[in-house]
A protein has these predicted regions:
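ATP-dependent adenylate-forming carboxylate-activation enzymes
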Residues: 1, 5-6, 192-198
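Gly/Ser/Thr-rich phosphate-binding loop
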Residues: 2-5, 14-103, 117
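Alpha-helix/helix-capping structural signal
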Residues: 9, 65-66, 138
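Glycine-rich phosphate/pyrophosphate-binding beta-alpha loops
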Residues: 64, 140, 194
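Extended, hydrophobic alpha-helical segments in both membrane/secreted and soluble proteins
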Residues: 82, 90-93, 161-180, 194-197, ...
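Conserved ATP-binding/catalytic segment of the ANL
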Residues: 111, 119-186
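Short acidic amphipathic segments
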Residues: 201-207
């Protein structure tokens, strides 16, 4: 295949069930501590992972859910050809994407130039997370025979309120933190996103 679109869970399962256990074996674990040998180990792992997806592809695009931070960091370390996209059914479906060579870790790509506009409902979109709002040719006109549901997500200016919370840098690259409905406001005013806690728990070997 030229292009592979998958959910993050597939990459995470391959990493936890196959890759991580193999790197914790005696000889391999020792080699990982030796300069130059570690790069050879990473190259070998990358080649095996690439072959497991058929070998002849340009890139793997993960989407549909957050990618575990440990898995993402490792895939970048071994130089695996992957990127992360972001979309909604209401946007038919892609909102942001970046070619793997230009992909920024922890992001979900750049808003599609010329097709989609995006803004963060925040006083400081680059630093303070807020709701991600989008509009453009690909955004739906409304839910079928459900004007009330449509009014709840699309405002008078045509912005679709996604319900996702995140930030956006100067070149319109999106960084998703979590869902507005799941966000917890602590007693000291700090926003807590369960998705970030879940990601850390998933990195534990006992989980």
């Amino acid at each position: 295949p030229h292009l592979i679109c998958i959910v993050p869970l597939i990459l995470e399962k391959i990493y936890r069930k196959q890759i991580k256990p193999s790197l914790e074996k005696g000889v391999v674990k020792l080699a990982m501590r030796v300069p130059l040998l570690d790069t050879q180990v990473y190259a070998s792992v990358c080649n095996r992972l690439t072959e497991s997806f058929g070998g002849e592809f340009t890139q793997v695009i993960a989407g549909g859910a957050p990618l575990n931070s440990e898995v993402e960091e490792f895939l970048h370390k071994i130089k695996f050809r992957f990127t992360v996209g972001y979309g909604l059914t209401e946007c038919a479906p892609l909102i942001s994407y970046t070619y793997y060579k230009d992909f920024i870790p922890t992001s979900c790509g750049r808003v599609l130039d010329g097709l989609m506009e995006a803004k963060i409902d925040s006083p400081d979109p680059q630093r303070i997370p807020g709701e991600i709002c989008v509009r453009g040719e690909h955004v739906m006109k409304g839910y079928y025979k459900n004007p009330e549901a449509t009014r709840q997500v699309i405002d008078e200016e045509g912005w679709l309120h996604t319900g996702d919370i995140g930030t956006m840098n100067e070149d319109n690259t999106l960084f998703i933190k979590g869902r507005s409905k799941s966000m917890i406001l602590s007693a000291n005013g700090q926003n807590i996103y369960p998705e970030e806690i879940e990601s850390k728990l998933n990195n534990m070997s006992c989980v």
